[in-house]
Each structure stands twice: as C-alpha cells, then as structure tokens.
Amino acid sequence: MPVWGGGNKCGACGRTVYHAEEVQCDGRSFHRCCFLCMVCRKNLDSTTVAIHDEEIYCKSCYGKKYGPKGYGYGQGAGTLNMDRGERLGIKPESVQPHRPTTNPNTSKFAQKYGGAEKCSRCGDSVYAAEKIIGAGKPWHKNCFRCAKCGKSLESTTLTEKEGEIYCKGCYAKNFGPKGFGYGQGAGALVHAQ
C-alpha cells in the first residue's frame, strides 16, 4: 500500500485500485474488470487463474500456450489442427504487422487491450463500479436506458436490435408484428354492426 494514501496499482492497467474493486493475485492487485485472461479475455477468479511471467491466463489458455505438447497431450477436439485449404488454392489470411503503442501505460495487458472497456452508448470508458453488462456489451448505469423512451432498464427487461437496447414496450411498438390481429388486446378491436 502506498505511504501517502490512495491504493495499490493494478497489475494490468497500472491505475490505482481501490478496495471496493480490488482482486489480489500472486501479491499483485487488479481491478475486477482488468482481471481477465490475456488471450481470451474471460473473467478470472482464484479457481480459474494461471500465472506465467506476471501475465494472467485462464487454465485453458495457459494449458494451450505453456502446457506439454506432443502425441497424447491433446485436450479433445479443440486442439486438433485444421486444414486451411492451401492445397485447394485458398489463400490464408495475411497477418497484420505489430504496431508499437503510443500509450504511455507500460502494462502489457493495457497496451494489448487498450485499458478500460468503452460504453456502448456514449463511448466513454466504463469502470467496474459503474459497469452493467447488457446484450453482451458494457454500459454505464446512466446509459443503460431504452433508446426510444429513456426508461431505465434491467438485464431482464431489455430487448436488443442492431446493437441498441429498448424496453419491451418500445421494442414491440417499433419492431413487433403489424397488421390485422396484432392490436393491443381487446381494446384495439372494433365491433361494427
């Protein structure tokens, strides 16, 4: 802990980690949102983390990268090599050259993944204390609202279309079925004599 207050520095992004969002591993501190596998970016915990040269991995990625290799050491069909079709004239995708970062943050993790995730609505950084996951994406608590009416949403009350989130009512009005027989209940029926 630093002498003059504040908190420990995150082992991934290098920023200050406060107690409410701290995860400790191998004598280092991490933000909960930074405690991710270096390869697949899955969230980690004390039962799924594996460490190699101060980098953190899930056990699956660690095994693939640093585990024993050779006949008899496969981990099921997921480790089989795939024919890429070169003999059929299919060209493999070109690999992009590595570009050095201009980010002053020297953390390998932050350089590789750009630090904090971005909010799907406003595009600003989302930190663990204010992050909500909805439709598989990060959102600020204040941005986690219906795109049409602005009503605050919960993960159980949202519907998603083309990357935007809506309350069930607005989704039904704007994207639901239309035409005869799709009124709003018995009040939409008209009886003519």
Curated annotation (Swiss-Prot):
One of its GO terms (cellular component) is focal adhesion. The modification N6-acetyllysine is found at residues 112, 131, 137, 161. GO terms for biological process: cell differentiation; muscle tissue development; sarcomere organization. A motif (Nuclear localization signal) lies at residues 64-69. Keywords: Acetylation, Developmental protein, Differentiation, Isopeptide bond, LIM domain, Metal-binding, Nucleus, Repeat, Ubl conjugation, Zinc. There is a cross-link at residue 91 (Glycyl lysine isopeptide (Lys-Gly) (interchain with G-Cter in SUMO2)). Signal peptide: none annotated. It is found in: Nucleus. The keyword Nucleus applies. Residues 10-61, 119-170 form the LIM zinc-binding domain. SUPFAM superfamilies: Glucocorticoid receptor-like (DNA-binding domain) (SSF57716). The modification N6-succinyllysine is found at residue 137. Highly expressed in the aorta, but not in heart and skeletal muscle. One of its GO terms (molecular function) is actinin binding. It comes from the Eukaryota. Interacts with KAT14. The LIM domain 1 is necessary and sufficient for this interaction. Interacts with GLRX3. Drastically down-regulated in response to PDGF-BB or cell injury, that promote smooth muscle cell proliferation and dedifferentiation. Seems to play a role in the development of the embryonic vascular system. This is Cysteine and glycine-rich protein 2. It comes from Homo sapiens. The gene is CSRP2.
